[in-house]
Amino acid sequence: MAQEEMEVDLLNLLNPMYSNRDVSTSHQPRGSGQVLFLPPPLTYSDDSEDLFLGPTEPHDVIVLDSVEEAPGQVAAPTNALQMLHSALEQLRQAAEQRSSVRPTRVQRRSTRRHQRGGSQRTAGTSSRAALSNFFQINRTQGVAPTSEREERNAALRTESSRTSPGDSSDETVELSEEEEGGGGSSTDVDEVDINAGAAPPAEPAPEELQINVIEVQAEAPESLPVPESVTLPLQIQKKQKTPVKQLSPVKHLPPEEDEGDTCAICFEPWTNAGQHRLSALRCGHLFGFTCIERWLKGGAAKCPQCNKKAKRADIVVLYARTLKALDTSEQERMKSSLEMEQSMRRKAELESAQCRLQVQVLTDECGKLRKQIQELKMLIAQHGTSTSMQASSSRSTISGSLSSSQGQHKYSFEKAILISQTGSCRVMSYCESMSCLVVSQPSPQTTLIPGCGIKKLSAANLKSSQYVPIHSKQIRGLAFSNRSDGLLLSAALDNTIKLTSLMTNTVVQTYNTGRPVWSCCWCSDNSNYVYAGLINGSVLVYDLRDTSNCVQELVPLGSRCPVVSLSYVPRAASEVFPCGGVLVGTLEGACFWEMKDDQYRPHVLPLEPGGCTDIQIESNTRHCLVTYRPGKNHNYVRGVMMELTSNRLNDSEDEYSCSCYPVQTFNAGNTCKLLTKNAIFQSPERDGTILVCAGDEASNSAMLWHSGNGTLLQKLQADQPVLDICPMEVNQSSMLATLTEKMIKIYKWE
């Protein structure tokens, strides 16, 4: 059984005395004796086994005379201390008696008496009285006898000794006071339930005893106040040890889950709403909004984690329910491996293309050698020469063929023709059916015939014939069809494309494009269609049978840069690239528009972004030449020969995915201020070799390269930058024309 403590509130015992003393002294005249009221004795009832406070008796009042306090200063405090000791002894005995009895309920009764002319005061009102005033005792008054109280206390001890320690009966202790007056009274009863557990005999549980003064009622008579009874309720409280409550263990998240959900300042989880919502600084570190706001206001204008400078305006609230870092290391590793594989694949494709080109050249040489061998055998059979003569002639023939195949021929200067004294020549084109070379130029007589036109040159005698006016502004493109009617397609900055007949030197058809035209070309598969490349990147498709508007517009997929070149790739029975369509070159890249059943499907070619100035096509071998101006990665003009390829989509026989890859690179000077046009064509030797010719502004020349090994074969000098290059066949002779702003130079292959 838990031990119980008993506490005696001495101050509450003395408060009623102070209160009565104050009441009495306030009504007596000056110089009279002081009256001291002592608490009534505690009595025990044998019938009800309750404790009662004894009635107020006359001997409990001690009158203190201030006049005689000098002679009795020694004896008076002694009597008062004896009375106080007697009262405390009674309380101790009552507590010992009640320790053997296990009360379960204590009834407290507070009685209020209403007397005529009286006033009610609580015990707390006189607690401020000095303790020294209590011990002013008058020697004339005797001490109240205590014989009756001692007898009652002895009876209480005898009764408590008869009570068994193991008795489990419940007892009720009632503390009451008797009423002396005849006035009405009201009684309030408060019941307090006390649970008492059985205690072992060896360890009795002490009880805590508190004596509180409930009420003091005083009646003030005319001469001397007569105090009412002082009620001292006895409250017995039992203290039991409360069992320790088992707290639920705190759940801790694993470090990998906890670290991503807590604020780095307060180490509390952030929320998706409220003041502690998820926020971030400009450096990217995450905190609770209130924490980082207080951190920055406190003078530390830096990130708590990386110490970068920060301010309150840098706080960004993130709207996220959960925040988890996605592990992309495997994805990045796969990307790097994919890029490595793609680079190796491009390198392998480049080597494969070079090998195929070399195989083609060697195959052609082998065919020629076999043909020569057959001719030699026929000659030997006809003339019947000896074996030695056959061997010597065979060796001489083979050595001659090898010397010719090694490229001993070259272009030699033939003639220079002045086109315009004022310059501004831009492009040229050759009509093979009429052996006519046309060059764009401004009008030689601007006052009579303003605008721009073309000058016709005869390739047979290399003489200029006449000027034909066509456009009102500068001409940017010229193209002939594969028909023999001599129709010239021209594009100019006056928002028109025109068809001009070289037979009559007149314009036969005009189409208004609405925007400046930078390039044009014919459709090789169907000569009724022509294409016009505009300044906004679009390509307009015109049908010569429809003289009003365009039949279709090819809108660019990417940027709207001007179309600097247009070339048509005809269909061919080739496994490498059987598709036909128009190749569109802009300042940002290239796109191949595949034509099938009068419908066009775009294929973006993988070229280097930016810096593209021209794209030319060699339709027989499906190669194209892309010219790049100097940039950040390269400080010189580059010409890259690309091979067009196609792959079937989803095992379909009609759908292809078109692309290209580089085969050879040619480097020129470090200056490129003009949009020049270059040329890629087959060698005049007819051995399958491809030659590349491009202008070099730094040296004012045209450079000729061998595409197989990338070697520079020849450098054709000019007095100005070369703007356009045109190879042509005249009377079974191969010739090359280079155009500057004022003149044309003709070179012949010898």
From Swiss-Prot:
It holds the Pfam family WD40_RFWD3. SUPFAM superfamilies: RING/U-box (SSF57850), WD40 repeat-like (SSF50978). WD repeats lie at residues 470-510, 512-552, 558-603. Its main location: nucleus. It comes from the Eukaryota. Binds 1 [4Fe-4S] cluster. Residues 92-206, 387-406 are annotated as: Disordered. Keywords: Cytoplasm, DNA damage, DNA repair, Metal-binding, Nucleus, Repeat, Transferase, Ubl conjugation pathway, WD repeat, Zinc, Zinc-finger. The keyword DNA damage applies. Its EC number is 2.3.2.27. Residues 168-181 have a biased composition (Acidic residues). Residues 105-116 have a biased composition (Basic residues). It catalyses: S-ubiquitinyl-[E2 ubiquitin-conjugating enzyme]-L-cysteine + [acceptor protein]-L-lysine = [E2 ubiquitin-conjugating enzyme]-L-cysteine + N(6)-ubiquitinyl-[acceptor protein]-L-lysine. One of its GO terms (biological process) is interstrand cross-link repair. E3 ubiquitin-protein ligase required for the repair of DNA interstrand cross-links (ICL) in response to DNA damage. Plays a key role in RPA-mediated DNA damage signaling and repair. Required to translesion DNA synthesis across DNA-protein cross-link adducts by catalyzing ubiquitination of proteins on single-stranded DNA (ssDNA). Mediates ubiquitination of the hmces DNA-protein cross-link, possibly promoting its degradation. This is E3 ubiquitin-protein ligase rfwd3.S.
